[in-house]
Protein backbone atom coordinates (compact mmCIF):
# COMPACT_ATOMS: atom_id res chain seq x y z
CA UNK A 1 0.00 0.00 0.00
CA UNK A 2 1.48 3.37 -0.98
CA UNK A 3 2.25 5.91 1.72
CA UNK A 4 0.80 9.41 1.67
CA UNK A 5 2.68 12.67 2.07
CA UNK A 6 1.59 12.83 5.71
CA UNK A 7 3.32 9.46 6.33
CA UNK A 8 6.73 10.71 5.16
CA UNK A 9 9.43 10.69 7.85
CA UNK A 10 12.32 11.91 5.67
CA UNK A 11 12.73 13.19 2.13
CA UNK A 12 15.99 12.93 0.19
CA UNK A 13 16.55 15.60 -2.45
CA UNK A 14 19.09 15.19 -5.26
CA UNK A 15 19.59 17.31 -8.35
CA UNK A 16 21.28 16.12 -11.54
CA UNK A 17 22.94 18.34 -14.13
CA UNK A 18 23.56 17.05 -17.66
CA UNK A 19 22.08 13.61 -16.95
CA UNK A 20 24.42 10.67 -17.44
CA UNK A 21 27.34 12.93 -18.33
CA UNK A 22 27.39 15.55 -15.59
CA UNK A 23 27.01 15.56 -11.84
CA UNK A 24 24.48 14.83 -9.14
CA UNK A 25 24.34 16.35 -5.67
CA UNK A 26 22.08 16.23 -2.66
CA UNK A 27 20.68 19.42 -1.19
CA UNK A 28 22.55 18.85 2.10
CA UNK A 29 25.93 18.38 0.38
CA UNK A 30 26.36 14.82 1.69
CA UNK A 31 26.67 13.58 -1.90
CA UNK A 32 28.21 15.46 -4.80
CA UNK A 33 29.54 13.22 -7.55
CA UNK A 34 30.55 13.28 -11.19
CA UNK A 35 28.32 11.08 -13.33
CA UNK A 36 29.59 9.49 -16.55
CA UNK A 37 28.41 6.57 -18.63
CA UNK A 38 30.43 3.39 -18.11
CA UNK A 39 32.86 2.39 -20.85
CA UNK A 40 30.51 -0.47 -21.81
CA UNK A 41 27.94 2.16 -22.81
CA UNK A 42 30.35 4.39 -24.71
CA UNK A 43 31.38 6.64 -21.84
CA UNK A 44 34.73 7.25 -20.21
CA UNK A 45 33.70 5.57 -16.94
CA UNK A 46 35.47 8.30 -14.97
CA UNK A 47 32.60 8.96 -12.59
CA UNK A 48 29.81 7.01 -11.01
CA UNK A 49 26.59 6.23 -12.84
CA UNK A 50 22.90 5.81 -12.02
CA UNK A 51 23.23 2.03 -11.86
CA UNK A 52 26.00 2.24 -9.24
CA UNK A 53 23.99 4.75 -7.23
CA UNK A 54 20.90 2.53 -7.42
CA UNK A 55 22.97 -0.52 -6.37
CA UNK A 56 24.40 1.43 -3.43
CA UNK A 57 20.98 2.59 -2.28
CA UNK A 58 19.36 -0.80 -2.75
CA UNK A 59 22.09 -2.71 -0.90
CA UNK A 60 22.03 -0.28 2.03
CA UNK A 61 18.24 -0.33 2.23
CA UNK A 62 18.14 -4.13 1.98
CA UNK A 63 20.76 -4.41 4.73
CA UNK A 64 18.54 -2.27 6.94
CA UNK A 65 15.53 -4.46 6.18
CA UNK A 66 17.61 -7.55 6.95
CA UNK A 67 18.48 -6.06 10.34
CA UNK A 68 14.81 -5.36 11.12
CA UNK A 69 13.77 -8.90 10.18
CA UNK A 70 16.67 -10.42 12.10
CA UNK A 71 15.72 -8.55 15.26
CA UNK A 72 12.15 -9.80 14.92
CA UNK A 73 13.42 -13.36 14.47
CA UNK A 74 16.07 -13.14 17.20
CA UNK A 75 18.93 -13.69 14.74
CA UNK A 76 22.34 -12.02 14.84
CA UNK A 77 23.27 -10.47 11.49
CA UNK A 78 25.85 -8.04 12.85
CA UNK A 79 28.57 -9.29 10.47
CA UNK A 80 26.32 -9.50 7.42
CA UNK A 81 26.97 -7.85 4.08
CA UNK A 82 24.52 -7.26 1.25
CA UNK A 83 25.60 -6.84 -2.37
CA UNK A 84 23.33 -5.52 -5.12
CA UNK A 85 24.28 -6.00 -8.76
CA UNK A 86 22.36 -3.71 -11.10
CA UNK A 87 22.55 -4.37 -14.82
CA UNK A 88 21.22 -2.18 -17.62
CA UNK A 89 20.36 -3.30 -21.11
CA UNK A 90 18.10 -2.69 -24.05
CA UNK A 91 14.50 -3.84 -24.06
CA UNK A 92 11.46 -3.19 -26.25
CA UNK A 93 10.89 0.17 -24.53
CA UNK A 94 14.49 1.41 -24.78
CA UNK A 95 16.40 0.40 -21.66
CA UNK A 96 15.64 -1.56 -18.53
CA UNK A 97 17.44 -2.73 -15.43
CA UNK A 98 17.82 -6.05 -13.67
CA UNK A 99 18.95 -6.61 -10.08
CA UNK A 100 20.63 -9.44 -8.18
CA UNK A 101 20.78 -9.27 -4.38
CA UNK A 102 23.13 -11.48 -2.40
CA UNK A 103 23.73 -11.54 1.33
CA UNK A 104 26.52 -13.05 3.36
CA UNK A 105 25.47 -13.72 6.94
CA UNK A 106 28.33 -15.27 8.93
CA UNK A 107 27.34 -17.58 11.77
CA UNK A 108 23.83 -18.21 10.40
CA UNK A 109 22.98 -21.53 8.72
CA UNK A 110 22.02 -21.45 5.05
CA UNK A 111 18.31 -22.18 5.54
CA UNK A 112 17.93 -19.47 8.17
CA UNK A 113 19.92 -17.00 6.06
CA UNK A 114 17.71 -17.72 3.05
CA UNK A 115 14.54 -17.23 5.12
CA UNK A 116 15.85 -13.93 6.52
CA UNK A 117 16.74 -12.67 3.03
CA UNK A 118 13.31 -13.60 1.67
CA UNK A 119 11.60 -11.84 4.58
CA UNK A 120 13.83 -8.78 4.13
CA UNK A 121 12.82 -8.71 0.46
CA UNK A 122 9.17 -8.44 1.52
CA UNK A 123 9.74 -5.40 3.77
CA UNK A 124 12.60 -3.53 2.03
CA UNK A 125 11.26 -0.25 0.56
CA UNK A 126 13.42 -0.66 -2.58
CA UNK A 127 12.10 -4.19 -3.08
CA UNK A 128 8.56 -2.92 -2.67
CA UNK A 129 9.18 -0.12 -5.17
CA UNK A 130 10.63 -2.46 -7.80
CA UNK A 131 8.27 -5.42 -7.30
CA UNK A 132 6.46 -6.19 -10.53
CA UNK A 133 8.51 -3.62 -12.46
CA UNK A 134 11.94 -5.20 -12.82
CA UNK A 135 13.52 -8.60 -12.26
CA UNK A 136 15.06 -8.90 -8.78
CA UNK A 137 16.81 -12.19 -8.06
CA UNK A 138 17.76 -13.21 -4.54
CA UNK A 139 20.98 -15.20 -4.71
Tell me the role of every PLM-derived stretch.
Residues 1-56, 63-139:
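Extended beta-strand/beta-hairpin segments
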Amino acid sequence: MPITQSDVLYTAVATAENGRDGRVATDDGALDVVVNPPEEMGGNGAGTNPEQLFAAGYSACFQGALGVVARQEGADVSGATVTAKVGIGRNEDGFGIIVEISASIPGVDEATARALVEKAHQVCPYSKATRGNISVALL
